[in-house]
């Protein structure tokens, strides 16, 4: 009998799409952090982002995840604004 190659906890389409949103947000945050001129600030922000995403990794509630993505996007926009002001 052939066994399935899928892991026992395969993601639904909705979960898969939400996961992609989270990963994209994480990548965008790390890209923005790379533009921080000060090495210690850059390391602090990178560690902060990593810990925040790790801390919320086990979240499964759809509304909670959506809210965290929204908050993450707002924080990313704030970081990008701050970096733009620092460059000008």
Swiss-Prot record:
Compartment annotation: Mitochondrion
Record key words, sorted: Mitochondrion, Transit peptide
GO biological process annotation, one example: mitochondrial respiratory chain complex I assembly
UniProt keyword Mitochondrion, yes or no: yes
Cellular component terms (Gene Ontology): mitochondrion
Keyword Phosphoprotein listed: no
Pfam families assigned to the protein according to its UniProt record, in alphabetical order: Complex1_LYR
Transmembrane segments annotated in the record for this chain: none
InterPro entries for the chain: Complex1_LYR_dom, Complex1_LYR_LYRM2
Presequence boundaries: 1-19
PANTHER family according to UniProt: LYR MOTIF-CONTAINING PROTEIN 2
Protein family: Belongs to the complex I LYR family.
Record's function text: Involved in efficient integration of the N-module into mitochondrial respiratory chain complex I.
Protein's recorded name: LYR motif-containing protein 2
